[in-house]
């Protein structure tokens, strides 16, 4: 089934609201094997909405509209769809009674314009709205399906899951499932080059995407049997792992910090961190993970040289000779936080996140990450690009990846 989404609302065109509905719907429809080829945003204008409907009606089997179901004069979606299809608007008594009950619950009386929301194109299947006053509806005409949904996500999402998803599932006999392989330490172009033959596969498909400092490969398989689909995905994942190897750090929703915490817990080891350029972001990422308290002993943000010297015990001579952003300082920060916290590992970050502070010798983006065990200290020099936020985020990923690699017995690059 070929589908598209028309999002109605001038506020979307003005950038006042982020269109999260289109993202949500596309993801859910993909699971049903429905291919979404077009997203359209249109303002609260009858003629322009009709133009969009005309285009969509000629190229798609399924058209979903979102927004424009409120009680005000600029809420025109149902009226415009009805006019486009040549259908009269008919009052639905159950919907009207539901609107009255909704207002009774909140101790208010509906105004006459609220009852506009109880009118639907003739023959439409009504979609109840348990979270608002704007029911949706489904219209089947000329072998096409038009689904009209409210704009607020708090209303659209429950309506879709309770009413629309089961309806569409009955109309399709194909399922799509995806798996996301997360890769760190290789750029997008390198990953694409390595897996290039797989990118031409038709089922399952493999698509590279860039995250914030990492790369993903999305495997998407389509079929009629869940077991068959899962086997296709697992076979493709195995092929990708054979090519990419240890640069793969997680699958689907799992994040780098979760991987590291699980490895520390599994090995009953502890970690402490001393941060400069990341300003507490590393500790935050770690403590975002439930159960981190079992393996995370201490986090120190030693932003100034005085803090590095007085709290962490970095030697004054080191700071004077090499500076705060140096191999030597990162080494001492990692060593000393490990000892201070009585932890198995110490992890440090020091660098120039910008936009100011760089010099020809030490430009913005220069970062050192230190990792201390009871036997050895590793220091990794990085030259990172991007704004201040990106440099900090990427530094944290590099730092956590060093710990991951060490715990898995993988060479630290």
Swiss-Prot record:
**Gene3D superfamilies found in the cross-reference section:** 3.30.70.2860, CinA-like, MoaB/Mog-like domain
Per the UniProt record, one Pfam family is: CinA
Name the InterPro entries on file. Answer: CinA, CinA-like_C, CinA_C, CinA_KH, Competence-induced_CinA, MoaB/Mog-like_dom_sf, MoaB/Mog_dom
Q: Which family does it belong to?
A: Belongs to the CinA family.
Q: What is the protein name for this chain?
A: Putative competence-damage inducible protein
**Gene name tied to this protein:** cinA
